[in-house]
């Protein structure tokens, strides 16, 4: 009952919080992909319940005994020479108290040249951000439902300005072992700034995601379907390149349809041989494709692909994600 009560309180609070997307809130790095596997499957996956200890950074309900004593370290050369990495570790105290999880995300924005309002150089400065999370999950009674939560401590330093914050992720997952089907609902980054950059309090990038996945019966493929940013339906913005100008010079901007909005909330992913020592991964983000593609070129924006290899007790994963003709990332 206490779990259900907490769930109701959180969602009641969310209903009075304005939905936030990129550029509308602080600590945006909290929504960076947590692993190459996640990046390869389109950028967001909520339903992997296996050895993958980094999955719990996005959905704490997936913390399970298979993660016991698993350590993951990931590094990405991101856009604009930004470097970031994640690390995660899980430990099972005993089968009754189950498994605890610790996760870390760190972003280094590099060095910048500073200038004052008169164009006089003020030297170089740096920027970096980090988040440390502690998570735990447990089964709800004897049902097929599991509940988990992460508590995150956030620090950010941009030039001479710094900020600290605290947030929580709350996740639920339904696991049907007979059908090999999982469904998850996650509320991420529900929190506040404890100290601000310059006296003005900013909201955190609150996000509600829904994920589904299933292992096909006769084919070694697990499909993933994720609906992201459910807290805000009109997620798309008109593309100026698609505006129409009539003979009188009047301009009509692009109208974003219901179907277009629906697809921009959608991420698809498939994993071939997910339980073997070698597997292939492919993902597609409709939103990334629509927002970053160039109309006159076919550059496969939104597409990502990767591989996974296992050597004894060590796993290696690599992913390449397409953003635009000018920028792609490796993880």
Model region roles, listed by residue range:
Residues 20-331:
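Subset of outer-membrane beta-barrel
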């Amino acid at each position: 009952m206490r779990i259900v009560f907490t769930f109701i309180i959180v969602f009641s609070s969310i209903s009075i919080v304005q939905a936030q997307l990129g550029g509308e809130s602080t600590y945006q790095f909290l929504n960076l992909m947590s692993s190459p596997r996640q990046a390869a499957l389109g950028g967001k996956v909520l339903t992997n319940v296996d050895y993958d200890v980094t999955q719990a950074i996005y959905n704490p309900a997936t913390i399970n005994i298979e993660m016991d004593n698993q350590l993951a370290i990931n590094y990405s050369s991101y856009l604009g020479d930004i470097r970031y990495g994640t690390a995660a570790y899980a430990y099972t105290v005993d089968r009754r108290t189950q498994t605890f999880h610790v996760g870390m995300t760190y972003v280094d924005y590099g060095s910048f040249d500073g200038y004052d309002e008169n164009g006089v150089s003020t030297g170089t400065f740096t920027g970096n951000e980090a988040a440390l999370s502690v998570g735990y999950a447990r089964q709800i009674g004897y049902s097929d439902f599991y509940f988990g939560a992460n508590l995150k401590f956030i620090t950010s330093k941009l030039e001479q300005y710094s900020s600290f914050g605290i947030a929580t992720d709350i996740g639920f997952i339904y696991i049907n072992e007979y059908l090999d089907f999982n469904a998850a609902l996650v509320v991420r980054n529900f929190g506040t700034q404890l100290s601000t950059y310059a006296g003005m309090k900013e909201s955190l990038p609150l996000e509600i995601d829904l994920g589904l996945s299933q292992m096909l019966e006769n084919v070694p493929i697990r499909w993933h379907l994720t609906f992201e940013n459910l807290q805000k339906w009109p997620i798309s913005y008109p593309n100026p390149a698609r505006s129409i100008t009539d003979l009188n010079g009047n301009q009509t901007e692009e109208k974003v349809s219901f179907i277009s909005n629906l697809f921009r909330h959608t991420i698809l992913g498939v994993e071939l041989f997910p339980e073997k020592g070698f597997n292939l991964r492919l993902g597609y983000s409709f939103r990334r494709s629509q927002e970053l593609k160039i109309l006159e070129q076919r550059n496969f924006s939104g597409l990502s692909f990767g591989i996974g290899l296992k050597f004894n007790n060590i796993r290696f994963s690599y992913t390449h994600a397409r953003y635009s003709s000018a920028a792609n990332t490796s993880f």
